[in-house]
């Protein structure tokens, strides 16, 4: 077997295997990157269904995690950014503003026991909030 033939076989095998990338994408592409509407299923079991720009989550979309947690809302540069709702697998839910993937701005956490934490969040932490019992 010639070296050239062997090299071509290796290239074909790597292109089918994907060089270890086990994410699965179905949707619009531009320059071989997700761009437009599409669904990405990640190796860890999470799944994003929404808009893409230059290979990053951008616009409106939903990210569902394997444990059942889910974010629905706005994205920018691959991060939760804008208005969105995050629901943890235990039923607690945050509704409000996000910046660079963190709770930032006005929002409310609704706890599964009926209580809620409402007010301003900064850098993913409560800043000026009030806790209300059920």
Report the location of each language-model feature.
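N-terminal secretory signal peptides that target proteins for export/translocation
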Residues: 1-2
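Glycine/tyrosine- and acidic-biased, solvent-exposed loop/turn segments at the edges of beta-strands
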Residues: 5-6, 13-134
């Amino acid at each position: 077997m010639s070296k050239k033939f062997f090299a071509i076989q290796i290239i074909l095998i790597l292109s089918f295997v994907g060089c270890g990338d086990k994410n699965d994408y179905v949707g619009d592409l531009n320059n071989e990157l997700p761009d437009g509407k599409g669904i990405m299923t990640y190796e860890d079991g999470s799944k994003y269904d929404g808009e893409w720009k230059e290979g990053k989550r951008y616009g409106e979309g939903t990210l569902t995690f394997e444990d059942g947690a889910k974010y629905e809302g706005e994205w920018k540069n691959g991060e939760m950014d804008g208005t969105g709702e995050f629901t943890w697998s235990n039923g607690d839910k945050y509704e409000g503003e996000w910046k660079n993937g963190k709770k930032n701005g006005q929002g409310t956490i609704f706890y599964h026991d009926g209580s809620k934490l409402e007010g301003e969040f900064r850098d993913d932490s409560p800043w000026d909030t009030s806790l209300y019992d059920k």
